[in-house]
Amino acid sequence: MSDSKEDIRNGQEEDDLFSENEDNHTSQQDELINGHIENDSETAVSDDGLFSNTEEATEAPEADVPVKKVLEVAVPNFKSPASASNDVFHAHIPNFLSVEQTPYDPEQYAAEAEADAALLEHDAHWGQRIKHKVDNTVRWRLGPSGSYQSNAQIVQWSDGSYSLRIGNDIYDTQNKLISQPTFVTASHEAQHLLRVQTSFKSSFTFLPSAINTATRSKLPSMRLTTVQVPSRSVQEIIIEKDPELLKRQAEKYEEERSRARRRLEKRKQLNNYQNGTGEEEEDYSSFYGPRSTYSEQNEIIDSDRMDRLKRIKQEGAGQYRGYNKDLEENEEDDLGDFIAEEEEEEEQEEEQEEDEEDEEEVGAGSDIKGFDADKEASVARATINKYEDDEVIPSAVETDRSETVTETSVGDGSVQRRVKRRIVESDSE
């Protein structure tokens, strides 16, 4: 039967909540104590029925076994939660059911009803909680004869299945045997003892009944007892630029930086190679020479490596942590200057190559003209001698230009050509 606060106010709640006819059916109305519905007890077996008279006659009499007293204490005799003729079940209470652990008191129930009515005037949602508290709460009390009475019952059907009835609502149950030994004990804290009263054989799990539409309609209100997990709201982010475009630009910028850094490293290696301090010009004969020379070269190489590693670490720390912004700006300036220098050097190399090509063309032509120039020079000298012998003075100054080509060898084995121009003059006296 269901609970009702109006029945309490009219003084009729006891007849509706706990029926007087339930006293005759104690085997089906044993209540839940301390949060669990327990209806089980071990069958008491008397010592007189352990052995028959024939067994006593055939077996030899046992010798007296000495009994040693270990401890003697006086403890209160707590009543077992279930009678010896019933079974005790362990129940898992779901979130849509609740159990009142204290005995039912009409006066206290009426006071709680008045407090709930006052809260209902300020909060309309409080009515759902009141309805859940009234309809889905297991209560118990002590009857006039001292037996336990409850508004909840475990019903066993003809097919062996079980159901839980609370008032007018029916709930399905799932029965499962307990594999591990589980016992109900009474605690005596003063004597530091635990007294075993009974054991559990099976456990129950309660579910809403599929045939009870009224119960199914109450499920939304039943969920109010669950813990509400706070959900995170959706975060809104305003994007002014295309993130994919920014990503591509950043990747392109990193590629340019890496390319410029590699070119700078190659330039440094080339300078070291030209200055004789690079690893490419390492003199392998130093392995067989004095130890001091080998140590000095190793120190130079190690110091260069340490400086390079230190610089790389500083660049990486400034790039990923953002602590060395000034270092990155200086590095960008150095990279920009280096790129400009590289472009100027490339232009100078191109101009030098063009000049060399022009000189080669001029040198090829001057080889042919050299012989004619020598011939003309000899003719001019002969003419001057003739004029001196004949004492004939020319009236004009004759000037002749001749070009000769000289070849000089360079240390690297290449031949460098130079064009020399010679002017032959004759003056009149």
From Swiss-Prot:
One of its GO terms (molecular function) is RNA binding. It comes from the Eukaryota. Transmembrane segments: none annotated. One of its GO terms (biological process) is positive regulation of transcription elongation by RNA polymerase II. InterPro entries: Leo1. Its main location: nucleus. Residues 328-362 have a biased composition (Acidic residues). Residues 1-12, 369-378 have a biased composition (Basic and acidic residues). Residues 1-63, 257-306, 320-429 are annotated as: Disordered. Keywords: Nucleus. One of its GO terms (cellular component) is Cdc73/Paf1 complex. It is found in: Nucleus. Belongs to the LEO1 family. PANTHER family: LEO1 PROTEIN, RNA POLYMERASE-ASSOCIATED PROTEIN LEO1. This is Uncharacterized protein C13E7.08c.
